UniProtKB/Swiss-Prot annotation:
It comes from the Eukaryota. GO terms for molecular function: transcription coregulator activity. Belongs to the Mediator complex subunit 18 family. It is found in: Nucleus. This is Mediator of RNA polymerase II transcription subunit 18. GO terms for cellular component: core mediator complex; mediator complex. Its main location: nucleus. One of its GO terms (biological process) is positive regulation of transcription initiation by RNA polymerase II. It comes from Danio rerio (Zebrafish).
Amino acid sequence: MEAPPVTVMPVTGGTINMMEYLLQGSVLDQSLESLLHRLRGLCDNMEPESFADHELVYLLKGQQGNPFILRARRSLLDPSVPWHLRYLGQPEVGDKSRHALVRNCVDVAASHSLPDFLNEMGFRMDHEFVAKGQVFRKGVMKVVVSKLSRVLVPGNTDNTEPLSLSYLVELSVLAPAGQDTVSEDMRSFAEQLKPLVHLEKIDPKRLM
């Protein structure tokens, strides 16, 4: 089967149950430095956070319908920090007035035995990848620029291969339900990143 669409959010702490507002795009490797320079000028006056994470995507197939998907992620830079378990709900794409994709997001810290727990619960690891990049912040908005690599040997994060010749760029906000005005702020910020990157409201179902 084709892998579910990737969404990259580094292990930097999580909120229990919020709505995620999301815009996505990509930038070619040769244009990366120009984008990073633009982000340094537009975002808060602080150094971006570097991250290198290993994510495992688990599926639990039910009697009918789509499988239940959970994402387990750990930091490769600091193995002592907790794992993170993430659930992303179905996107609410029907409202054309929203400038961003909106979906429920549940994010909790977990112990290092998380993979064993998921296996015991009947989940099957579908695929894994490594994400390396930087996180910029602009108020409540977060911009993640990351290079995604496939893991060639299961569990061996030292043996990877880039998925593409580009970087994934994600602009997101975590907020309580009903805070749709943040999508207008996101749209305005995304306009300032053109033409280096075009951030869009992407329906994951179109990519399946």
